[in-house]
Amino acid sequence: MNENNISIIIPAAGVGRRMKSYGPKPLIKVGNSTIIKNQINLLRTYVANSNIVLVCGFKAERLMNETPEFILKVENELYDQTNVVRSIGMGLRASANCLGVMIVYGDLVFNSEAIKHISFQKSSVVIAERGMGDEEVGCIIGTDNNLTHLMYDLAPKWGQIAFFTGLELQLLKNLCWDEKNNTKFGFEIINNIIDKGGSFNCIQNDKIQIIDIDSSKDIQRAREILL
């Protein structure tokens, strides 16, 4: 698949209750740059010709103003009444003609290993054996290295990065464009896709590092990834 036919959706509308005073989490500085700029730099390196769609919500104007002009920005004005699925759905509307969609949550700090092994020929999820907190969603992986189910209280963790194409992309659109799913989490939609016959390869190796920034302690841990 040509990279020109790939869209990267970065859902970044949520408040982040424990870090609200920091403003939009993608603008938190980690190392010499912000979370979102670190993400974009890596994504532009490894998926150079893709289209990037940033979905804003909490303090949307500030986030839009402090991110590069070459990315597309849309606003989930109902961010405080809905969940990430509505933001993903809005990103999909802006990516209508793409053959593949990568989703990267907007509060992640990760290294190049987290994205450079993604194949654009098959839907997949990135597994994080290091970095993600115990409270994050874990994975049940089948003997064929395909994802069976996502649920809490399991290891290894889903790294909140996924790629969708073919049947899985069509199911993602159908589910995210259904209003009754607006309050769902992303992992619930992935489970729904699997239940409807979709399949996700699991990308995992011990060099992948991903941290979901949920506290000030996570910021210090994230700096070590970028060293």
Where in the sequence are the language-model features?
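Conserved alpha/beta core of the MobA/IspD/sugar-nucleotide pyrophosphorylase nucleotidyltransferase superfamily
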Residues: 2-6, 157-227
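Conserved core of the sugar-phosphate nucleotidyltransferase
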Residues: 111-188
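Short beta-strand/turn micro-motifs composed of small residues
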Residues: 12, 31, 56, 105, ...
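Short alpha-helical oligomerization interface
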Residues: 22-26
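N-terminal nucleotide-binding beta1-loop-alpha1 segment
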Residues: 1-21
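Conserved N-terminal catalytic core of the sugar/cofactor nucleotidyltransferase
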Residues: 1-7, 33-100, 179-181
